Structures are given as C-alpha cells and as structure tokens.
Regions:
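An N-terminal, globular interaction/scaffold subdomain
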Residues: 1-174
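Aromatic-residue detector
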Residues: 3, 14, 21-26, 31, ...
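Internal helical hairpin/lid segments
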Residues: 263, 267-308, 312, 316, ...
C-alpha cells in the first residue's frame, strides 16, 4: 500500500481492490465544522482519487461522484461502538451508500473542542464499472460542542436526503440534546433488547416521542424476530388450524430471565413486541397494562435462567402494527451479523 498524505491527509492509493469489497480511498482530519466541509469538498475535486497503483503503473479509475441515498447519523457513546457501526455501514456502501456521521462526546464540562476524521470508502461493483463511493465522518466533541451534537450534525447533512439517526446504546428519551437530534431526523434506529431493566419505561418514552414527532422508528429487537413471526403465521396457513384464530382470548409468553436479578431486571422488549404483533394481527388491543409475572423456576425453563410468563389480557379491537421504511434495516442487521461472525473468526485464529 502507498499513501499520498499531506498535512491534512488526502487520497490513498492501493493495489487494485477486490470487486464488491469496500476500500479506503481517502483519509484526512479537521478541527472545525468549516474544516470538515472543506475536506468533504476536497474529496471529490482531487484528481488522485481517480487513480490506482498497479506495480509501477498508475492507471485511471472510473470513480463515481459522491453517491448517497440518505444521511446516517450514529450516536456512539464509546469508540468501539462507533468503529463497529462503521464496519457495518461500509459493508453496505455498494448497495446503500450514505453520508455517515459518527458522533461521540467527551468531557462535557471542559473547554469546547472538536476533532474529526474524514474518510471515503469506494466499492467496485465489477471490473468495467464506476466505483460507488461514500463518506464517513468521525467526530469527537468536548465542552459546549459535546452537549449540542445537533449543531455539529446540521451543517454536515446533504440537503434533500432523508436523515436517519442510529442510536446503538439506550437513547436518553426526554433529554433536550436527544430531542434536538430527533427533531431533524426522519427515522430513528434503536436496539431495545439492550436497554436497562425491563425496558418498558423506555418503550413508553419512545412511543410518546413518536406521538409528538413525525418520526419513523425501527428497532432491531423487532426485526430479529421476523423468523418467529413467519413461523407462527405459517402454522395458520394450514386450513384446519385457521378456525382456532377466532377463539384466542389470552396470550402468555414465556421468556428467559436473568439469573442474577430475576424477572424485575430482565429486558422484556422482545416479548412485548411479540405480544404486540400477535395483538395487531388478530385485531386485538391491550385491556390492562403489560407486566411481568413472577413464577417459580421449572425444569423445562430456558437454560439462561428461570421462566417468567408475560400474561397479556387482550380483547378484540382495531390495533395495527406498521413496519417498513426508507432505509435498509434488514440489510444493516445482516451486515451486523456478518461483522460479528468476522470478529469470532478473528478471535479463533
């Protein structure tokens, strides 16, 4: 590998890339919003980005101009979370390119500062095609800037493209900094299965957020259950079983609980989603609040702990669960799984 980097960084030349694999073609740094904007402009005006090194010969590349279908903003509490999300997003560059801004805050009570790394990854779909390239901006901000991340995000957005906020950790629903980010977004991506406690309070706050803002929400906890939903639905594709649907009056869901804290500290977001899906498909609604009910450990309980039935009293109604959206949530989830598999293989080696 040969890198052509000045003081602020710049294009990187590699030996020919593998078709379909993302390759780092640009890397630079900036210490202000204005500096980030200048580096983003430099990426697409640099003639060196269109060249590749093949032995001693420099050949022209067919590099597409900036290709983006959305703005993706990732709020990463820790550096390793941001890096994992970036690896996932880079896998999608060829199919779902985006301008990605990965934000981390540090030392909110100290002086205001900003440090940014600007990268461009390109994917060659086939030998005779133009490469698809997308930008990734890693921003760490401290002091006043770290408390107002929306002020950093706003000038870096590509206008007229949808904005998606991906919050891998537990979003602080109700806090003003988070609300400021939500207000500029079209979609929020979360993973409710990792929230503290039962997760019910966070679900309530998230539902209140959606009532207040025209914000679509995708939760990996719901997406991961798609095979369960398909399996249950396929049972009632059998004509002899279909009549039983009309006689369902009560649903009990049994799930694994934490060994160290029991049902009171076990996240039940996925069981709640499953109950909600069943209720929506059957035209039911919740008659009284959902709550975990303690039960003794049984020999047939899941291996991770005891069994706690989530009893839901449901009756006929008009509830409906709407899924879908403009962004490839399923594709992101698949890329996440692929990243985890690569990490496991690396550890084994």
């Amino acid at each position: 590998m040969e890198a052509n980097l000045g003081m602020a960084g710049g294009p990187i030349t590699f030996t020919p890339a593998t078709i379909g694999e993302p390759v780092l073609r640009w890397r630079s740094r900036a210490r202000s919003i204005e500096g980030i904007e200048q580096e983003l402009s430099r990426i697409w005006t640099s003639p060196d980005l269109n060249r590749d090194l093949d032995g001693d010969k420099i050949t022209d590349l067919r590099v597409a101009a900036r290709t983006s279908v959305m703005n993706l903003v990732v709020i990463a509490r820790r550096q390793e979370i941001g890096e994992r999300c970036a690896s996932t997003i880079q896998r999608l560059t060829g199919r779902h390119p985006s301008r990605t801004t990965i934000l981390s805050s540090a030392d909110p009570d100290g002086p205001s500062w900003l440090d940014a790394q600007i990268q461009a990854h390109c994917v060659l779909p086939r030998q005779d095609a133009a490469a698809t390239c997308a930008e990734t901006i890693y921003v760490t901000a401290g002091g006043e800037g770290g408390r107002h991340l929306d002020a950093i995000v706003a000038p870096l957005l590509i206008h007229d493209l949808p904005v998606t906020v991906w919050w891998p950790d537990e979003p602080p629903f109700g806090s003003q900094p988070a609300n400021d980010l939500f207000e500029m977004a079209d979609r929020l991506i979360v993973d409710g299965s990792g929230w503290r406690g039962t997760g019910l309070e966070q679900l309530r706050r998230m539902a209140a957020l959606q009532e207040r803002l025209p914000l679509a929400i995708s939760d990996f906890a719901l997406v991961r259950q798609s095979r369960w939903r398909e399996t249950i639905a396929s049972i009632f594709d059998i004509p002899n079983f279909l009549p039983y649907l009309r006689h369902l009056r009560r649903i009990a869901i049994t799930y694994a609980v934490r060994e160290d804290g029991g049902a009171e500290t076990t996240n039940i977001v996925k069981p709640v989603y499953h109950a909600a899906w069943l209720a929506s498909r059957l035209g039911m609604r919740v008659e009284k609040p959902l709550a975990p009910l303690a039960s003794p450990v049984r020999p047939s309980a899941p291996r991770h702990g005891g069994a706690a039935p989530l009893a839901t009293a449901l009756r006929r109604g008009g509830a409906q669960l709407v899924a879908g959206g403009r962004i490839p949530v399923q594709a992101i989830l698949a890329a996440l799984d692929a990243t985890e598999e690569d990490e496991r293989e690396t550890r084994v080696e």
